[in-house]
């Protein structure tokens, strides 16, 4: 069969018409250098700060340095197979992590990938790790408490839902223990908890998970681990991932609590990344934007109005407020709260709980220094009964510390001074509390009532602990209805005052005489 020229040209035209050549625009670049997990890329245009960059071998990097001639990015995970000359491309999206109730009870890494050998997590929602904090109009004043279960904190340094309360102190002073007990105390309160472990040993976090499971708090908690053995980029990202998970609950009209343990290690990880990216170092070799690192994270914790919730859920949830409470932890060196990172975070947060190593070593647990520990929300975050009964505690302790220091230089003391010293010693003894022994509002209230109304005056200092234990046992078994009422409503009136007086008088007469 022979074809003429016209037939050949017709066949070619038909083939050309049938061709479907797709047109695809890609934002690609070439790796020019690889060192210590940092890659520099030439040719990327319109790349965003924090954007995910797709690498060969199904790996990703995050763009952190946007320079005129190149883009500096940090590889997430191993960079062994990444080499110069490889082609990379922008994804057009920043890092997102899975969020939702499916994560409760699980241990995940900084990217939301499960690491507890309990199978995959099927989440239908993903949030970006970086998001804008709620504006001033969207926020609501804080008027509900987060009960820590510690007498000293709930009475002197109350924490409200939506507050940012810093826990600061030297190493081994009980900072993590305080935060873990607060999480355990939320197991029946409906507050969802997120515990972010940054730069800690994996074995330490395993013990924390076991304790949460033992006290039935794990099912209400998400644990995020970026251990000391993991890369600096994951330790830097972990708090933002945890915050995104907490924001999901807040934006759906629920209350959430997040613990950052601790932000000192995140600052160190960010310093490593910044120095690798050749950013100019400042004070203590930290980069110039180290304040912004923590401020943009902690400002996302807030109590928001019902209109904000309605807007976030597109009208699905109405008439509900939500909150995200943050407990950042900062480690100090030799009690120096005036160092760079501590002063930064103190200025961002709504108060601080300062734990002192001298008090800790003296057996005062929790080792709270009431002089410089403060809550800027104050009594508005307390129930009425706690607000009324806790008023004289801080004053009594302040007077006791002043007199105790003065009495060291005086050989003879008058009766009034001696009584004040004895009262201060008893209050200090009464505020001591062991780990994993959280107290309900009712139990705290009757103890504070006993202090305020002088029921401890005739009790020896050595018997204060025994008095407290027996009083709580008596109250729980004989006045269950009153306990339930105080725990639910937190109200205080002359009727409750008379009931508490009768309980204490009967207890001292029959059970502790």
UniProtKB/Swiss-Prot annotation:
Q: Tell me which UniProt keywords the record has, alphabetically.
A: ATP synthesis, ATP-binding, Cell inner membrane, Cell membrane, CF(1), Hydrogen ion transport, Ion transport, Membrane, Nucleotide-binding, Translocase, Transport
Instruction: Give residues annotated as binding ATP.
Output: 169-176
- A GO molecular-function annotation: ATP binding
Origin superkingdom: Bacteria
Subcellular localization, as worded in the UniProt entry: Cell inner membrane
Task: Provide the E.C. number(s) assigned to this enzyme.
Answer: 7.1.2.2
- Pfam families referenced in this protein's UniProt entry, alphabetically: ATP-synt_ab (PF00006), ATP-synt_ab_C (PF00306), ATP-synt_ab_N (PF02874)
How is the protein disposed in the membrane?
Answer: Peripheral membrane protein
Query: InterPro entries recorded for this chain?
Result: ATP_synth_asu-like_sf, ATP_synth_asu_C, ATP_synth_asu_C_sf, ATP_synth_F1_a_nt-bd_dom, ATP_synth_F1_asu, ATPase_a/bsu_AS, ATPase_F1/V1/A1_a/bsu_N, ATPase_F1/V1/A1_a/bsu_N_sf
Record Gene3D superfamilies = 2.40.30.20, ATP synthase alpha/beta chain, C-terminal domain, P-loop containing nucleotide triphosphate hydrolases
Grouped into one coarse class, the protein's main location is membrane
- Which reaction equation describes what this protein catalyses? ATP + H2O + 4 H(+)(in) = ADP + phosphate + 5 H(+)(out)
Q: Does the keyword Nucleotide-binding apply?
A: yes
Q: HAMAP family, per this entry?
A: ATP_synth_alpha_bact
Quaternary assembly: F-type ATPases have 2 components, CF(1) - the catalytic core - and CF(0) - the membrane proton channel. CF(1) has five subunits: alpha(3), beta(3), gamma(1), delta(1), epsilon(1). CF(0) has three main subunits: a(1), b(2) and c(9-12). The alpha and beta chains form an alternating ring which encloses part of the gamma chain. CF(1) is attached to CF(0) by a central stalk formed by the gamma and epsilon chains, while a peripheral stalk is formed by the delta and b chains.
Name the chain's protein. Answer: ATP synthase subunit alpha
Q: Which organism is it from?
A: Blochmanniella floridana
């Amino acid at each position: 069969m022979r074809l003429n020229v016209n037939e050949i040209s017709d066949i070619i035209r038909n083939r050309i018409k049938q061709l479907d050549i797709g047109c695809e625009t890609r934002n690609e670049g070439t790796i020019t250098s690889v060192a210590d997990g940092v890659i520099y890329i030439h040719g990327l245009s319109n790349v965003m700060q924090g954007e995910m960059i797709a690498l060969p071998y199904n790996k990703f990097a995050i763009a952190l340095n946007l320079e005129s001639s190149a883009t500096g990015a940090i590889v997430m995970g191993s960079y062994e197979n990444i080499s110069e000359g490889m082609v990379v491309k922008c994804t057009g999206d920043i890092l997102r992590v899975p969020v939702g109730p499916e994560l409760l009870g699980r241990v995940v890494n900084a990217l939301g990938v499960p690491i507890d050998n309990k199978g995959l997590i099927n989440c239908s929602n993903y949030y970006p790790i970086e998001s804008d904090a709620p504006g001033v109009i969207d926020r609501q004043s804080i008027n509900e408490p987060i009960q820590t279960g510690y007498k000293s904190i709930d009475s002197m340094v109350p924490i409200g839902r939506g507050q940012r309360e810093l826990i600061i102190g030297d190493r081994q002073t009980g900072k993590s223990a305080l935060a873990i007990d607060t999480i355990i105390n939320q197991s029946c309160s409906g507050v969802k908890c997120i515990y972010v472990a940054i730069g800690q040993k994996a074995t330490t976090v395993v013990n924390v998970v076991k304790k949460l499971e033992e006290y039935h708090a794990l099912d209400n908690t998400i644990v995020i681990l970026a251990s000391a053995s993991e890369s600096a980029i994951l330790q830097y990202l972990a708090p933002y991932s945890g915050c995104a998970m907490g924001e999901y609950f807040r934006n759906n009209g629920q209350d959430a609590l997040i613990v950052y343990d601790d932000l000192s290690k995140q600052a160190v990880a960010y310093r490593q990344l910044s120095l690798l990216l050749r950013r100019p170092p400042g004070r203590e070799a930290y980069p110039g934007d180290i304040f912004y690192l923590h401020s943009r994270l902690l400002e996302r914790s807030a109590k928001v109005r019902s209109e904000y919730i309605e807007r976030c859920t597109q009208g699905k949830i109405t008439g509900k407020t939500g909150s995200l409470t943050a407990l950042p932890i900062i480690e100090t060196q030799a009690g120096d709260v005036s160092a760079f990172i501590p002063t930064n975070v103190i200025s961002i947060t709504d108060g601080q709980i300062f734990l002192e190593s001298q008090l800790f070593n003296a057996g005062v647990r929790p080792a709270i220094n009431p002089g410089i520990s403060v809550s800027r929300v104050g009594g508005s975050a307390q129930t009425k009964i706690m607000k009324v009964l806790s008023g004289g505690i801080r004053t009594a302790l302040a007077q006791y510390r002043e007199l105790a220091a003065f009495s060291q230089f005086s050989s003879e003391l008058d009766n009034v001074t001696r009584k004040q010293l004895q009262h201060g010693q008893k209050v200090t003894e009464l505020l001591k509390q062991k780990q994993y022994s959280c107290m309900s509002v009712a139990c705290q209230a009757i103890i504070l009532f006993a202090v305020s109304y002088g029921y401890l005056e005739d009790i020896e200092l050595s018997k204060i602990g025994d008095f407290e234990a027996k009083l709580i046992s008596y109250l729980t078994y004989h006045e269950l209805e009153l306990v339930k009422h105080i725990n639910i409503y937190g109200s205080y009136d002359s009727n409750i005052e008379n009931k508490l007086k009768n309980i204490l008088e009967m207890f001292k007469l029959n059970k502790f005489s």
